[in-house]
């Protein structure tokens, strides 16, 4: 028996619109089953997509996509959208090398109206499209679909503020599941999920107390009264929820509709048809459940936000085998260092912009809850907030991904560096990140950090050096950033101490002849592998700023040529810093600069991506040998 007779008919939204509305609930079930199977094979974002199935079907059923524009915020919930827009048979390639991207991507499909990956951009982008359509005299509709987690970011409110004052036809769908990746924080989620009216609860309690004894004596009366009580509570909650939400968004100039059940697809279709006919800014408040339809994800949406594979819901836990201990990830090394340091220093505080699990802060929050601050998806605020803490003598550590640190660049300069405030940035996911692709790659931090005055920039080559540099930069009386990659370390033993190294000094990892490899961070390991074959010297620079000028000059004068290696953009990166030192000292030597060229990277297996970029050990060897051969031929 065909498990998906309706879904098999759909290769585009045009096919979807041929279905009767009464068939849509069945289609939703088939689509959810397909998601379970496809994500179970490929991994990827999971719980968010399960929660957006009915909403996605309804949007494509009502709106004339791709003529009408759907802009998905972040893109975590875009898999059903991809399935319904002609990519169903490619879902087995999701996030794989050469396959479908894990986020909407304009070059992948005409249905992907705007490329995303970071949060809170959808309203601004959809507003721009609506404004353009008005200028062009088009009657197309633009829709922004944004989660309540993304609504905690200032950019979303900037767009709401602007949209409410513009005469454009825009729909904002607020997908309210009370989650971002972790549970939401801040006043806005509490506002959206406000409790029932207190007076109603008080009244119900009084009635129960005064009538309970009587009702107990009447058969079935107490059960009936409990049902009435539950219904009154539910109505009170919905009324209060709607009243408060309406007040907020209508004050922004939007006409508010909701909240509505985001899993009742037939009702969603009716509501969206009505909204599509309206003029001006509209906001639809939809209530969904993250992980809907898969009990494990419903019960633990944080764990199942993104998965590598899926266990069977009924599968028994298998006894663990005696396996060798896995190498720790850099994130784990940071998390342990942070807890160790906090236990010894009561001034240490940790800040994260809604990335508790990803940044390794779960244990810290449990052990030091008063010194843990999750500020929501608000990177700009996170940095300035850290500056305020530093002004009062605290020792802030901002745990943040490299790609998200980009969103707070002005705050880095204006609020931290210009005031020389001692804030430590633990910059995770530096370099290639793999399946999440270019929107999440950390390829620019060395370039944009090293030009900031007062900033110390460090790049460890292994997990023990990561701990050393974290301890060193924490004790520096200046702003500092330690950038480290995603994934496991090299397997070296990690100290439990708080040893430090001299700021701005590198070390020689291997002595060789003629060719000197000046390597930074994750590129030290491939440099060592290639140096063994070429008998080259390898310097682990440790710091990009201040850079070890003395070591660079010594290597340049004692070797015939230099190769710089970094997992960062070549423009403005660490290799450029080496060239600046050579120019400053009047040294003219052949230099091969190896980094990420001026290109947008792909997604998939990090090893394949590094090979494509010429930064795997094998690729570095090929490039260096070719460079040496060309130089020999030229001479």
From Swiss-Prot:
<feature type="binding site">
    <location>
        <position position="76"/>
    </location>
    <ligand>
        <name>thiamine diphosphate</name>
    </ligand>
</feature>
<dbReference type="GO" id="GO:0030976">
    <property type="term" value="F:thiamine pyrophosphate binding"/>
</dbReference>
<feature type="binding site">
    <location>
        <position position="177"/>
    </location>
    <ligand>
        <name>Mg(2+)</name>
    </ligand>
</feature>
<dbReference type="InterPro" id="IPR005477">
    <property type="entry name" value="Dxylulose-5-P_synthase"/>
</dbReference>
<feature type="binding site">
    <location>
        <begin position="149"/>
        <end position="150"/>
    </location>
    <ligand>
        <name>thiamine diphosphate</name>
    </ligand>
</feature>
<keyword id="KW-0460">Magnesium</keyword>
<dbReference type="Pfam" id="PF13292">
    <property type="entry name" value="DXP_synthase_N"/>
</dbReference>
<keyword id="KW-0786">Thiamine pyrophosphate</keyword>
<feature type="binding site">
    <location>
        <position position="148"/>
    </location>
    <ligand>
        <name>Mg(2+)</name>
    </ligand>
</feature>
<dbReference type="GO" id="GO:0005829">
    <property type="term" value="C:cytosol"/>
</dbReference>
<dbReference type="InterPro" id="IPR029061">
    <property type="entry name" value="THDP-binding"/>
</dbReference>
<comment type="similarity">
    <text>Belongs to the transketolase family. DXPS subfamily.</text>
</comment>
<keyword id="KW-0808">Transferase</keyword>
<comment type="subunit">
    <text>Homodimer.</text>
</comment>
<feature type="binding site">
    <location>
        <position position="177"/>
    </location>
    <ligand>
        <name>thiamine diphosphate</name>
    </ligand>
</feature>
<keyword id="KW-0414">Isoprene biosynthesis</keyword>
<protein>
    <recommendedName>
        <fullName>1-deoxy-D-xylulose-5-phosphate synthase</fullName>
        <ecNumber>2.2.1.7</ecNumber>
    </recommendedName>
</protein>
<dbReference type="InterPro" id="IPR049557">
    <property type="entry name" value="Transketolase_CS"/>
</dbReference>
<feature type="binding site">
    <location>
        <position position="294"/>
    </location>
    <ligand>
        <name>thiamine diphosphate</name>
    </ligand>
</feature>
<dbReference type="Pfam" id="PF02780">
    <property type="entry name" value="Transketolase_C"/>
</dbReference>
<dbReference type="InterPro" id="IPR020826">
    <property type="entry name" value="Transketolase_BS"/>
</dbReference>
<feature type="binding site">
    <location>
        <begin position="117"/>
        <end position="119"/>
    </location>
    <ligand>
        <name>thiamine diphosphate</name>
    </ligand>
</feature>
<comment type="function">
    <text>Catalyzes the acyloin condensation reaction between C atoms 2 and 3 of pyruvate and glyceraldehyde 3-phosphate to yield 1-deoxy-D-xylulose-5-phosphate (DXP).</text>
</comment>
<dbReference type="Pfam" id="PF02779">
    <property type="entry name" value="Transket_pyr"/>
</dbReference>
<keyword id="KW-0479">Metal-binding</keyword>
<dbReference type="GO" id="GO:0000287">
    <property type="term" value="F:magnesium ion binding"/>
</dbReference>
<keyword id="KW-0784">Thiamine biosynthesis</keyword>
<dbReference type="GO" id="GO:0008661">
    <property type="term" value="F:1-deoxy-D-xylulose-5-phosphate synthase activity"/>
</dbReference>
<dbReference type="InterPro" id="IPR033248">
    <property type="entry name" value="Transketolase_C"/>
</dbReference>
<comment type="pathway">
    <text>Metabolic intermediate biosynthesis; 1-deoxy-D-xylulose 5-phosphate biosynthesis; 1-deoxy-D-xylulose 5-phosphate from D-glyceraldehyde 3-phosphate and pyruvate: step 1/1.</text>
</comment>
<dbReference type="GO" id="GO:0016114">
    <property type="term" value="P:terpenoid biosynthetic process"/>
</dbReference>
<dbReference type="GO" id="GO:0052865">
    <property type="term" value="P:1-deoxy-D-xylulose 5-phosphate biosynthetic process"/>
</dbReference>
<dbReference type="InterPro" id="IPR005475">
    <property type="entry name" value="Transketolase-like_Pyr-bd"/>
</dbReference>
<dbReference type="GO" id="GO:0009228">
    <property type="term" value="P:thiamine biosynthetic process"/>
</dbReference>
<feature type="binding site">
    <location>
        <position position="379"/>
    </location>
    <ligand>
        <name>thiamine diphosphate</name>
    </ligand>
</feature>
<dbReference type="InterPro" id="IPR009014">
    <property type="entry name" value="Transketo_C/PFOR_II"/>
</dbReference>
<dbReference type="GO" id="GO:0019288">
    <property type="term" value="P:isopentenyl diphosphate biosynthetic process, methylerythritol 4-phosphate pathway"/>
</dbReference>
């Amino acid at each position: 028996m065909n498990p998906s007779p309706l879904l098999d008919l759909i290769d585009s939204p045009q096919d979807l619109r041929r279905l009767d509305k009464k068939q849509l609930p069945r289609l939703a079930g088939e689509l959810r089953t397909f998601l379970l199977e496809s994500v179970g094979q490929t991994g990827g974002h999971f719980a968010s997509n399960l929660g957006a199935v009915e909403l996605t079907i309804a949007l494509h059923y009502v709106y004339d996509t791709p003529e009408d524009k759907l802009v998905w915020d972040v893109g975590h919930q875009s898999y059903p959208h991809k399935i319904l827009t002609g990519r169903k048979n490619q879902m087995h390639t999701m996030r794989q090398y050469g396959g479908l991207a894990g986020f909407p991507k304009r070059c992948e499909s005409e249905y992907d109206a705007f490329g995303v990956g970071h949060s809170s951009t959808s309203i601004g982008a959809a507003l721009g499209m609506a404004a353009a359509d008005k200028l062009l005299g088009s009657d197309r509709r633009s829709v922004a679909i944004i989660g309540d987690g993304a609504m905690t970011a200032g950019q979303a409110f900037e767009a709401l503020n602007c949209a409410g004052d513009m005469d454009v036809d825009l729909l904002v769908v607020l997908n309210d599941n009370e989650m971002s990746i972790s549970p939401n924080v801040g006043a806005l989620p509490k506002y959206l999920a406000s409790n029932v009216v207190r007076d109603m609860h008080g009244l119900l309690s009084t009635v129960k107390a005064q009538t309970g004894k009587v009702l107990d004596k009447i058969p079935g009366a107490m059960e009936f009264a409990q049902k009435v009580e539950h219904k009154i509570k539910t109505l009170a909650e919905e009324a209060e929820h709607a009243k408060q939400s309406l007040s907020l968004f209508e004050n922004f100039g939007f006409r508010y509709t909701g909240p509505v059940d985001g899993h009742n697809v037939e009702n969603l279709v009716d509501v969206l048809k009505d909204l599509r006919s309206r003029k001006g800014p509209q906001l639809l408040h939809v209530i969904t459940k993250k992980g809907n339809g898969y009990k494990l994800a419903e019960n633990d949406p944080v764990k199942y936000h993104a998965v590598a594979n899926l266990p069977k819901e009924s599968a028994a836990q298998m006894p663990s085998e005696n396996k060798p201990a896995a190498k720790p990830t850099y994130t784990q090394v940071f998390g342990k260092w942070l807890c160790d340091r906090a236990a010894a220093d009561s001034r240490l505080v940790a800040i994260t912009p809604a990335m508790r699990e990803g940044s390794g802060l779960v244990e810290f929050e449990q052990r030091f809850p008063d010194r843990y601050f999750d500020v929501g998806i608000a990177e700009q605020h996170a940095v300035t907030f850290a500056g305020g803490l530093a002004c009062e003598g605290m020792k802030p550590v901002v745990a943040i991904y490299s790609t998200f640190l980009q969103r707070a660049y002005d705050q880095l300069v204006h609020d931290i560096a210009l005031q020389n405030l001692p804030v430590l940035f633990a910059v995770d996911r530096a370099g290639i990140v793999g399946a999440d692709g270019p929107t999440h790659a950390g390829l620019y931090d060395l370039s944009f950090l090293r030009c900031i005055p007062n900033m110390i920039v460090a790049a460890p080559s292994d997990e023990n050096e990561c701990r050393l540099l974290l301890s060193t930069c924490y004790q520096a009386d200046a702003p500092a950033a330690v950038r480290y990659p995603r994934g496991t370390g090299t397997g070296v033993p990690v100290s439990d101490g708080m040893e430090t190294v001299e700021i701005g000094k590198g070390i020689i990892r291997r002595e060789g002849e003629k060719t000197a490899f000046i390597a930074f961070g994750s590129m030290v390991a491939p440099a060592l592998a290639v140096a063994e074959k070429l008998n080259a010297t390898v310097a682990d620079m440790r710091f990009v700023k201040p850079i070890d000028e003395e070591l660079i000059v010594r290597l340049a004068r004692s070797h015939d040529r230099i190769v710089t290696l970094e997992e960062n953009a070549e423009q403005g990166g660490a290799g450029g810093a080496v060239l600046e030192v050579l120019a400053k000292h009047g040294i003219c030597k052949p230099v091969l600069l190896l980094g990420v060229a001026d290109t947008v990277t792909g997604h998939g297996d990090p090893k394949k991506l590094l090979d494509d970029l010429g930064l795997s050990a094998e690729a570095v060897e090929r490039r260096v040998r070719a460079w040496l051969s060309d130089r020999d031929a030229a001479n």
